[in-house]
Amino acid sequence: MAKAKYERTKPHVNIGTIGHVDHGKTTLTAAITVVLSTSGGASVKRYDEIDNAPEERERGITINTAHVEYETANRHYAHVDCPGHADYVKNMITGAAQMDGAILVVSAADGPMPQTREHILLSRQVGVPYIVVFLNKSDMVDDEELLELVDMEVRELLNSYEFPGDDTPIVAGSGLKALECGCGKRECEWCGKIWELMDNVDAYIPTPERAVDKPFLMPVEDVFSITGRGTVATGRVERGQVKVQDEVEIVGLNEKPRKTVVTGVEMFRKLLDFAQAGDNIGALLRGVDRKEIERGQVLAKPGSINPHTKYSAEVYVLTKEEGGRHTPFFNGYRPQFYFRTTDVTGIVQLPEGVEMVMPGDNIKVDVDLITPIAIEEGLRFAIREGGRTVGAGVVTGIRE
């Protein structure tokens, strides 16, 4: 039997299970693999295989995450599931597992709980754009009215965090019953609910825009001059594409962006007509002096990104065990903020009524940088002191 090769004919979407501890996220994840495996769309993953997620390090932060993949008739999915609440917080803030949408698991027997609320809030903050709900353990609820009550409660909760609660698909079922049955038939009382959930995920969570289709951006990693030809900026194209003769802007470290034209693109010492997201390139820039561009700036499609100094962010502060601070920090804390390729000093303003932030906390803060940097909502950064990472964050809004 020849090994099946991975055919990327279907659109790819990243999703994950979120919700309160013990509401059945991991059981549901296992059930999805079992049900989809009956039509050849997945390899069966047992509960304990998912639950014993390996440790990963993302920006110096230890996160336990299980990665499962499966496909429906229309799409290929990469699905993340985390064993502990802290792992979700870290995952969502560092963007270690970028989610195009999430399956919110709520126990029908208990209704929404504190972490249900916190995961919805985090999804709103870090830009998880779509949520589909699975009311799990509904085999334990005999009263139809109780199910309707939980359904209403979840919709109200989603509305309160600016998700369209009234239009959100909610499927009631039981991950455990589907897992125990495993027949995978659509007409089955329990396996059918898993199919219904996946049909809703297929229909409700849109296919994300691919990185190459977004406006061009390349963080500048290094700069050198070629005698007789001009200045070359090197880096990895983060998104979009760039062609020879395209106009671009140099953004960051100065008050205003500066326009220039890309007169050459090279990769592995070969000249190219264009480069796209993922390529490591050197871009030859017209009329730019070696001293007028530096690491920490970005090359971008004109008008697509601006330099800013003031923004709001959701941050996670590393614990002592993770190599972070041993002590809390206070209002006016001045660490370095590492964006893409460079460190910039900034001042932290804590929310009203918050005196201090302890290692292990996650919190919303305002930051004022001393130098403008090309930033936008959704951009991830590290917080450092003397080159050592003490926190991670994501930009949730630009203040000016």
Swiss-Prot record:
Residues 174-176 are annotated as: G5. Mg(2+) binds at T26. Gene3D superfamilies: P-loop containing nucleotide triphosphate hydrolases, Translation factors. Residues 10-209 form the tr-type G domain. GTP hydrolase that promotes the GTP-dependent binding of aminoacyl-tRNA to the A-site of ribosomes during protein biosynthesis. NCBIfam families: EF-Tu, PRK00049.1, PRK12735.1, PRK12736.1, small_GTP. Monomer. This is Elongation factor Tu.
